[in-house]
């Protein structure tokens, strides 16, 4: 269970570190209440974990060594350490208070460790979560100093290290502070602030629909889509589209009839061709985003509008290349580039964009939500699914349904929303129940048929009156005693 560290206690840990920074390196030593007593690399890491955990036995107790991590000693887990999962910090769902990197070389001078405190004490307080963190290390002495805090200390992810752990503890929640999502977008993409303000809704929609729910996915999406769309400028390809006019492999007609221009590349990922417009329409309809499953086939120019730019990219991201999010979780920039581009064209620009976005860290999550819990991507997905279940149309299964239109689409009379199906089922099912019950001698339901035959029922159309009279005629022919019983109880028909 993840330990919750109070801000006051985190401040105490920082004070303990600051008091010992500048000490000499002490191989085999341990920190004590005397701030001049010192320790080595593993003692520093293990005792700092004990400080965060509030253990009372830390004084003079170094707990173990770098080998304790390599050999999975129990004390490492007792202190609260866990090995980082393949997805890294992003896969945890929270920022731990401490991250650790290790070099394993059999102990002694060939092994080393350092850590980064992911809490930061700032002037005037309070302690807060930090995406960069404060590096904290005991190492070989430089000018008589072996214990470094901030400057001079290696970070947990220094290239020297190849084994990574975290302390399963996080800082307590603090007061919610407003974050300007447009500013975050500008920092993550290099866009001017005013452009970021204008693009934010389309970016947010695209990220949510693409299920980009962690910083790694968001950074990859911003980098790749930013490159593919000419820095988010192009919502339609710059060429006319005439080159696609007879591309039957894209679903366009073989004639030179303008299909190329109608269905040229649009959205930030350039959805191209009538077939792809149809596939995207069905996907968008299934999510409750458009009213019909052929919406963009009928209204292709709308796909050039900014509001669809990110959503179009999300369709490609999740449907056409469904492994991209998993690759993004692994930060596999090259493979994602191949999925989108077919090669590694302009990889340097994609990498530049990617690193720029990654540097923003967890604040990227601001782009997919706000203070409203309904902005949470999971909640929004549930809402879309519920909306789709209620209001998306399904085609009638009745063999008496109307024929399809000449273009293969369904007439509106064959399409039903859930509430329409319920009402339709009630309309057909109840009528059938009443008539069958009347034929079986149920005088209560026979009363309904008699009333309808007199033109006094809910449906007073000539067609339905004739239907009710036909039911009475069938009963009279097959079971006249039912009508006689009804007349005996109620009088003449």
UniProtKB/Swiss-Prot annotation:
EC top class, as a word: hydrolase
Example GO BP: defense response to bacterium
A molecular function GO annotation: hydrolase activity
Enzyme Commission number, as recorded: 3.-.-.-
UniProt KW Metal-binding keyword: no
Source domain of life: Viruses
UniProtKB keywords: Antimicrobial, Bacteriolytic enzyme, Cytolysis, Host cell lysis by virus, Hydrolase, Viral release from host cell
Record bears the keyword Membrane: no
Entry similarity comment: Belongs to the L5likevirus endolysin A protein family.
Stated role: Endolysin that degrades host peptidoglycans and participates with the holin protein in the sequential events which lead to the programmed host cell lysis releasing the mature viral particles. Once the holin has permeabilized the host cell membrane, the endolysin can reach the periplasm and break down the peptidoglycan layer.
Protein name (database record): Endolysin A
The species this protein was found in: Mycobacterium phage D29
Annotated gene: 10
């Amino acid at each position: 269970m993840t330990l919750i560290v109070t801000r006051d206690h985190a401040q105490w840990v920082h004070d303990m570190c600051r008091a010992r920074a500048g000490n000499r390196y002490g191989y085999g030593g341990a920190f004590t209440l005397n701030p001049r007593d010192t320790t080595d690399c593993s003692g520093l890491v293990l005792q700092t974990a004990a400080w965060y955990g509030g253990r009372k036995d830390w004084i003079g107790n170094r707990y173990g060594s770098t080998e304790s991590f390599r050999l999975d000693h129990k004390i490492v887990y007792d202190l609260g350490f866990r090995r980082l999962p393949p997805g890294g910090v992003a896969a945890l769902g929270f920022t731990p208070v401490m991250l650790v990197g290790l070099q394993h070389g059999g102990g002694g001078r060939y092994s080393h460790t350092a850590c980064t405190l992911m809490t930061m004490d700032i002037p005037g307080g309070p302690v807060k979560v930090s995406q960069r963190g404060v590096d904290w290390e005991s190492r070989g002495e430089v000018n008589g100093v072996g214990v470094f805090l901030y400057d001079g200390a290696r970070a947990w992810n220094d290239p020297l290290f190849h084994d990574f752990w975290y302390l399963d503890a996080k800082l307590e929640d603090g007061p919610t502070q407003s974050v300007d999502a447009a500013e975050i977008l500008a920092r993550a993409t290099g866009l001017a602030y005013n452009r970021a303000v204008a693009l934010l809704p389309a970016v947010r929609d695209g990220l949510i629909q693409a299920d980009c729910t962690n910083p790694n996915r968001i950074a990859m999406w911003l980098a790749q889509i930013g490159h593919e769309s000419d820095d988010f400028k192009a919502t339609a390809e710059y060429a006319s589209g005439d080159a696609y006019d007879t591309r039957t492999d894209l679903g366009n007609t073989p004639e030179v009839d303008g299909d190329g221009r109608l269905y040229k590349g649009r959205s930030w990922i350039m959805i191209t061709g009538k077939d792809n417009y149809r596939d995207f329409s069905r996907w968008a309809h299934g999510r409750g985003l458009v009213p019909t499953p052929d919406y963009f086939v009928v209204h292709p120019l709308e796909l050039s509008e900014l509001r669809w730019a990110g959503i179009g990219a999300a369709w490609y991201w999740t449907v056409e290349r469904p492994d991209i999010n998993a690759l993004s979780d692994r930060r596999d920039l090259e493979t994602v580039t191949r999925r989108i581009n077919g090669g590694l064209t302009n990889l340097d620009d994609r990498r530049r964009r990617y690193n720029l976005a990654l540097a923003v860290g967890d604040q990227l999550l601001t782009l997919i939500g706000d203070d409203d819990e309904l902005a949470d991507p999971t909640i929004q997905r549930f809402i879309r699914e519920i909306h789709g279940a209620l209001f998306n149309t399904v085609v009638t299964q009745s063999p008496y349904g109307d024929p399809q239109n000449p273009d293969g689409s369904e007439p509106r009379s064959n399409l039903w929303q859930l509430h329409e199906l319920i009402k339709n089922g009630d309309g057909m099912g109840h009528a059938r129940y009443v008539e069958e019950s009347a034929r079986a001698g149920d005088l209560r339901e026979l009363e309904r048929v008699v009333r309808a035959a007199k033109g006094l029922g809910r449906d007073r159309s000539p067609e339905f009156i004739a239907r009710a009279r036909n039911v009475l005629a069938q009963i009279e022919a097959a079971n006249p005693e039912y009508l006689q019983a009804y007349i005996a109880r109620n009088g003449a028909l």
